[in-house]
């Protein structure tokens, strides 16, 4: 049996994260995430779940021009050193799409449900989307309220 994506409108909390920016094909995100994790371990920084900010829509952006931030969530008092960067996403109102599925299926199902929601509500995809993987559950959040 296949899982269905769950779509909700909700208030998302603020997130503090360490990251590296990636330009080019999104297929490189996995190796960049491993690099961020290794740097955090080397710097002895405690981290929790993986986070990705998709800054470009792959449906309309050539693969060499795509931009993403990939990293890990941190506590409010953690600090990092170069080459890692630190940022905070403020609390905001979002459309949240979640699914617990194998990664090969999870991303397609969540973004498919998000695009369908946007079409049904007469809106376009708002960027950046935030992806968080927690206990094998992928959650994609799209910001609302700035149209």
Question: Language-model segments: which ranges?
Answer:
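A solvent-exposed interaction/effector surface
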Residues: 1-147
């Amino acid at each position: 049996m296949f899982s269905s994506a769950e779509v909700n409108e909700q208030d998302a909390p603020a997130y503090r994260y360490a990251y590296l920016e990636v330009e080019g094909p999104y297929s490189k995100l996995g190796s960049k995430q491993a690099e961020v994790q290794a740097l955090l371990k080397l710097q002895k920084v405690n981290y929790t779940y993986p986070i990705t900010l998709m800054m470009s829509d792959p449906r309309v952006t050539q693969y060499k021009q795509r931009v993403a931030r990939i990293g890990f969530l941190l506590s409010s008092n953690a600090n990092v050193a170069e080459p890692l960067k630190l940022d905070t996403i403020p609390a905001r109102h979002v459309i949240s799409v979640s699914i617990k599925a194998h990664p090969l299926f999870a991303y397609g199902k969540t973004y498919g449900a998000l695009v369908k929601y946007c079409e049904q509500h007469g809106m376009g995809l708002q960027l950046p989307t935030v992806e968080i993987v927690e206990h094998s559950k992928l959650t994609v959040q799209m910001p609302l309220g700035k149209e």
